[in-house]
Amino acid sequence: MKLIPFLSEEEIQKLQEAEANSSKEQKKTAEQIEAIYTSAQNILVSASAGSGKTFVMAERILDQLARGVEISQLFISTFTVKAATELKERLEKKISKKIQETDDVDLKQHLGRQLADLPNAAIGTMDSFTQKFLGKHGYLLDIAPNFRILQNQSEQLILENEVFHEVFEAHYQGKQKETFSHLLKNFAGRGKDERGLRQQVYKIYDFLQSTSNPQKWLSESFLKGFEKADFTSEKEKLTEQIKQALWDLESFFRYHLDNDAKEFAKAAYLENVQLILDEIGSLNQESDSQAYQAVLARVVAISKEKNGRALTNASRKADLKPLADAYNEERKTQFAKLGQLSDQIAILDYQERYHGDTWKLAKTFQSFMSDFVEAYRQRKRQENAFEFADISHYTIEILENFPQVRESYQERFHEVMVDEYQDTNHIQERMLELLSNGHNRFMVGDIKQSIYRFRQADPQIFNEKFQRYAQNPQEGRLIILKENFRSSSEVLSATNDVFERLMDQEVGEINYDNKHQLVFANTKLTPNPDNKAAFLLYDKDDTGEEEESQTETKLTGEMRLVIKEILKLHQEKGVAFKEIALLTSSRSRNDQILLALSEYGIPVKTDGEQNNYLQSLEVQVMLDTLRVIHNPLQDYALVALMKSPMFGFDEDELARLSLQKAEDKVHENLYEKLVNAQKMASSQKGLIHTALAEKLKQFMDILASWRLYAKTHSLYDLIWKIYNDRFYYDYVGALPNGPARQANLYALALRADQFEKSNFKGLSRFIRMIDQVLEAQHDLASVAVAPPKDAVELMTIHKSKGLEFPYVFILNMDQDFNKQDSMSEVILSRQNGLGVKYIAKMETGAVEDHYPKTIKLSIPSLTYRQNEEELQLASYSEQMRLLYVAMTRAEKKLYLVGKGSREKLESKEYPAAKNGKLNSNTRLQARNFQDWLWAISKVFTKDKLNFSYRFIGEDQLTREAIGELETKSPLQDSSQADNRQSDTIKEALEMLKEVEVYNTLHRAAIELPSVQTPSQIKKFYEPVMDMEGVEIAGQGQSVGKKISFDLPDFSTKEKVTGAEIGSATHELMQRIDLSQQLTLASLTETLKQVQTSQAVRDKINLDKILAFFDTVLGQEILANTDHLYREQPFSMLKRDQKSQEDFVVRGILDGYLLYENKIVLFDYKTDRYDEPSQLVDRYRGQLALYEEALSRAYSIENIEKYLILLGKDEVQVVKV
């Protein structure tokens, strides 16, 4: 097909005019059309939340394909695998539709080829592209194509630790061991070992992994801050700050003397006020920095006289108290600023004095880091296992050093497209530059939604292009999508009101002006005053709680407020639970949130990443069991195992056993005492009674058998032996939240199996890996279990990005920002390099013996202070963007929920606004989201803000005021039905009383069971069923049926029945994670989770399962997982025509897709068959019952029914 020319500027303008004048209900905006059709230059699309950026990308791709571009000529990078899958699905539908609509034969054929090539298109994450690239071109760097990815954090940690200790030993024993020893001591802290240094090394390594060339950055930028340090300039800046602070203080005191001070004539503090004014008055234009510093020192000294009371207005007159309080508050603020400046003078002096020593330390650190980076790189090459960042580095290395490879890709790609460009890091940006020909990049993103700085994403990459393209269109085209098609006008107005007053270039990194403001465009949502954004505050005054306490009472007060609103939405407005989302900035309070919701019976599902897997009780018990098997001399682990439900020793029994003597008096341990207790049991019956002796013998025998088994079997087999020997897996399943506990135990076995497949063998190394993960204060992700279908969503703001919910609650608005990075011993900057705290040893000059002769002083280097300021601004900017993402998730209504003392909050005063923004100090002194919202509410009281705050006290949050969750009946989700089992039991008891009466009156009906499964009904009715003249399977002679003369199998190997295979296949289909890409490897891992024997697993053909998902029905299921229901139980009342009795039909539907006006029902069958019609006939009646149950439940008549036949070598999907 010939390439059709792209649209000119004039043609695009005509298209925009035609669209504006069209009668379409939902029109494309002029900017969307511009973004879809503009070509032949670099394009940056700044797409605000809800502006349809995915639609624009898909339309642009479709337009290019329709003009003759091949799908293989497009490089399309998405931020997540899920986003790539969704884009492919959207393109598949659009291309298919275009094929149907066009009459052009050439275009049909061309688009048909693109549709066929779509699965192989370069649409995916950067990581997926680099993996394929290195697999193809890695030979250029001597990298084997069968490399693997170090996705397991624990395996990565083991490798890092091993390499660290190798490099550490080399430096510690090397020529520069004295300077290295100084470096080691600088980070040793209280531990006085290498852990402090190791922590900083790993932190710097993670930072380096986001640079395009780690070694180059280390050599060129790591010491840049030391090289350009200018203390003269810093002193001048500090002097200017001192001048300004002294002038501010002078202005404040003079205003006070001229006004309020007249009310306090002859008050003692006024003399000291005048004294300070005289000191400041001694300064003039000729005064140098020394003079200013001297005045500052005298002023600060006066402010500290009499513990600060020298300048305090101590008036106790009731009518003058507000004036006195206001003066004292401002005075404290002014002198706190002066005190900080006084400290900075001293710090700057120390920084200059120890600059040379700190630089020397930094050079030693640079040398160590360089060796570590190279050693770790080589070690990973030996293992042929890499992190994703390594793959990217090698890809860049090949593209930079092999021009023929780079040019082939630049010629191949007609356009290089990237989604979520605001979250790009420097290594990704370099790769995009190398793949592009310089003028064919299409970048879509929104800097206001850049929230991944902790992953080294740099929003300034986006911002730099935004500014450059805006100022010089020749550099590239800037297109701004402002219209929001997602949210109500109430949500958008509240969001604009907040960020117009909060975000600017100084704090926020962008000016929130008309280029960034959200514009309402969802014409389907009409304005509704009830949807005005609500800023809800739990009033702590009612409970008298302390400001900083984090008690459960306080949190449940806030949660009760939320629960009240949820119940109101659900019960008064009919809002489904799944339409409500609870967003948090972190998961630290999730346990208490979940507890509060469960107390009121509100179903909830989390984002599945609690990261507290190793803290779960059942996993801790198993880890202690493994520790004891490895080394029984560990007392803590041994006691934990003995007290666990597996053996159940109580305190009395353990005390009796611990009173035994040990062989080793110096290092006595419990295990030796147990051995001795076993030997001496017969002679110490008073201490070791018979029952205890038998219990101890059983424990020691089982432990010995496990230890022996561990020597000859895999970890996976050992763990399952423990589960089976002591029925531990079954035991935890009977506990509250049993399925989740069992899933955790499953995961432990699987993780042990993965560990041993990663070139690490043995129980010892597995335990050491777990201990290292715990020591590093990391954890493994918790295992997700099937969530309820209709449930409130609880997730972090990061996880909510890209999602939307009708009603959004932003919780914990009062939770303080995480500032751990700014308290670290090391702060890095891409521009300045290393900032470090130097530990200086100083002579005290003390003569007396009881005074220390030397002290250690922690001195932040000049670069550290500069990096700290840069980090503070970047952190506050990111927090603003995080709040923006959270607020723009809401479609209809937004709730911002916090807590605080009403009295304290309402008494707070703030500086006046400047240029329509909060004062920069107000913004930078905020500790949390709530501080910003409250300050806006107070400073802009005259503005008609589109959100309102409201305090809610304890009197409004009693159990009666909140209410209860009303129970409802029609076809409930099984998770909610479980909450009402007590009602079912009561009904059952009432029915049992009448059993005898029913038996007497309805004897004829007794032959028909009252509760049946569809298969039972089929068997019961087979003699009389008439399925439109079709013969019932199993009746009469089967035509053409082959007769088998095979000898019976008398072998001793395990027999596998068809029922076992069928049951295992059904469980496998239920467990498959459809959100991930399906591969043979992923199915193999899922199969391991199926509760069956290995013999049955061996009989399941995974290729056939994989083939099913390539069928039309399989693809429809993958594309519509939001509509998918699997393994759904149902019950239905039917009447037997012979006895005229009602009976209940119960069963489990394999799965169905629920659409608005249609249901697609499917059922898996593993029966053997000759012709599909045999199984269609056999199961037609069963599917008819399923159809009837669904039709009754959802009032939908249009139901398609499919049998998925897995009984032959090839899968068949048959419509019934």
From Swiss-Prot:
Keyword Endoplasmic reticulum tagged: no
GO molecular function, one term: double-stranded DNA binding
Domain UvrD-like helicase ATP-binding: 26-488
Gene ablation phenotype (knockout): Cells lacking this gene grow poorly, are more sensitive to UV light than wild-type cells and have reduced double-strand exonuclease activity.
Lineage per the UniProt record: Bacteria, Bacillati, Bacillota, Bacilli, Lactobacillales
UniProt GO BP: double-strand break repair via homologous recombination
Enzyme Commission numbers on file: 3.1.-.-, 5.6.2.4
GO cellular component: a single term: cytosol
General function of this protein: Involved in DNA double-strand break repair. Is not involved in recombination during natural competence or in plasmid establishment.
Recorded catalytic activity of this chain's protein: Couples ATP hydrolysis with the unwinding of duplex DNA by translocating in the 3'-5' direction; ATP + H2O = ADP + phosphate + H(+)
One Pfam family from the record: PDDEXK_1
Record-given protein name: Exonuclease/helicase subunit RexA
Complex and partners: Heterodimer of RexA (AddA) and RexB.
Annotated residues for binding of ATP: A47, S48, A49, G50, S51, G52, K53, T54
Cofactor field: Mg(2+)
Signal sequence bounds: none
UvrD-like helicase C-terminal domain segment(s): 515-802
The keyword Acetylation is annotated on this UniProt entry: no
The family this protein is said to belong to: Belongs to the helicase family. AddA subfamily.
Keywords attached to this entry: ATP-binding, DNA damage, DNA repair, DNA-binding, Exonuclease, Helicase, Hydrolase, Isomerase, Nuclease, Nucleotide-binding
